[in-house]
């Protein structure tokens, strides 16, 4: 199976973040024989929607499975190949943060604004900073109408709407593979010992502080042989 890991970073500040996190992504790809693709020029605004180009990458380069990681992520050096966790009938796998965070009302509001089925209620809300998808889920990467790109958690809420709209065969990723601060608190995880992937979601307000946090966590993981 032809596989790739895709990440993206835009602007000098985020390129500095990627400089810190990319070596671990490269090591992960080398261990698991996966191609690494880094999108570093924005294709649309908000820039986070650039990840929708994964559909084109799949179609033009023949990938059967793609793992996406935000650039503000540290991958432990003993991290399993995430794609092997994909259930047989599942075509899109991500962590369902809507199971414990109040995300679904915003998704419902977006659906109503775009004229989705009246009375519809969302059944999940995935964090799209880490996901695995196959070439059977490309429809979920559909773009919004030109000039109407919603900015509700960037592209995340729109992608969740598309996953519902296309009746994509989804499955939930273990929180250890998307260990955000809220995940640590809710599930009682230790980022250094339990996490396979540490995700610094929601910490971009102070990039310099984020960079120092990533440096410190990277050093701690190395100290633990991870």
Which positions does each model-derived feature cover?
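Short catalytic/ligand-binding loop motif for oxyanion handling, primarily in non-cytosolic enzymes
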Residues: 13-14, 46, 76-77, 83-84, ...
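A residue-level signal for conserved active-site and pocket-lining positions in enzyme catalytic cores
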Residues: 5, 29, 55, 72, ...
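GT-A fold catalytic core of metal-dependent nucleotide-sugar glycosyltransferases
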Residues: 43-106, 132-135
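Short amphipathic alpha-helical segments and helix-helix/interface helices
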Residues: 22-26, 55, 80-83, 156-163, ...
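Short, flexible, basic/aromatic active-site loop/helix in glycosyltransferases
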Residues: 108-122
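Short, surface-exposed amphipathic charged segments that create phosphate/polyanion-binding patches used
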Residues: 52-53, 106-111, 186-193
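N-terminal anchoring/stem segment of glycosyltransferases
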Residues: 1-64, 166-167, 201-226
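Catalytic core and acceptor-binding pocket of nucleotide-sugar-dependent glycosyltransferases
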Residues: 123-210, 217
